């Protein structure tokens, strides 16, 4: 019998890596929960509650056929990379980049992860902005509201985000 996504979420939180791997054999990796998240979207937000190492978990999802660039089926339609940036989760972010995540994937509003990195920048080290740009993120992709990451950086007055562009 196939597990539903809510059952797999509980498995992620309460079992070992081997048990998670076994559970994935009975799971449709392309399924979404009622909020529009696939298992990678869920993991990108809840990974600190899972015992297994981040690299191993993401590779396991890839091995079972997850599309690491898939966007949520509802809400803002963000990818796991968008979520990692918004949560400032360097662990997830770095692994997704190493595994080939598209730095220019657009969400339901046309925002790329770099737009989100500019938006959540708060005077910290600029890691997400700099890393995305160095990995080929385009600074000029216009979202559904006519704003690019570079334009957003120029408009933000409370932090000096312009310096990254």
What positions do the PLM features span?
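Ankyrin repeat A-helix N-terminal signature
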Residues: 10-15, 42-53, 83-89, 116-125, ...
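Tandem repeat domain/solenoid detector
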Residues: 98, 102-104, 134, 138
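Ankyrin repeat structural motif
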Residues: 16-24, 50-63, 89-97, 122-133, ...
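Ankyrin-repeat boundary/"N-cap" motif
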Residues: 2-9, 32-46, 71-80, 106-118, ...
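Eukaryotic tandem repeat interaction scaffolds
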Residues: 75-94
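Leucine-rich solenoid repeat scaffolds
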Residues: 138-165
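Intrinsically disordered, low-complexity regulatory segments in ankyrin-centric signaling systems
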Residues: 1-64
